[in-house]
């Protein structure tokens, strides 16, 4: 098996790269940081925790609206998803080798240029209100929510959406929190696997990943 290269970038991010011919002409990436929603803290709006990933899905990235970005990703055969879990934040994606420059640019923009999108937000607020109004009448959703609560030991942080939590959700505050979680490259490990030569990958890492903003401190998760 081929060796794994470990690169420590100037901004404190760590890159683990393994060349692999398992999937021809493709690169996969996972960026993982510690902390996640556990950093919301007891003083801030706890209801935001249930909607962080909805906020991510309905925000613009690098000037692309959510629908424009979906279209671009589809056209270029790129996958790209970001999320915030209870104890981590992550970005994962894959791209064909001929789209690597665009892919790394989109990864960079996902960290640095995420903004609210008014049209997407208003559609989301309308649809979510309808969904949550109907939720209590769905035996399947009630069952799913019950399982989630049990899994989280009835914690207040169990990601169960309801009209009550939605009424307390603050969109701007949640978006600011998401951006804060992705504002410290020093906190991230990038795991990259693909059918690509190191000579081709390294300049992209140096141009995009190494220039991500950093606070030069490592985060951890808060025990809730």
Go through each PLM region and give its residues.
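Extended non-catalytic domains of envelope/secretory-pathway proteins
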Residues: 5-9, 169, 195, 199
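A common structural junction motif
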Residues: 108-118, 208-216
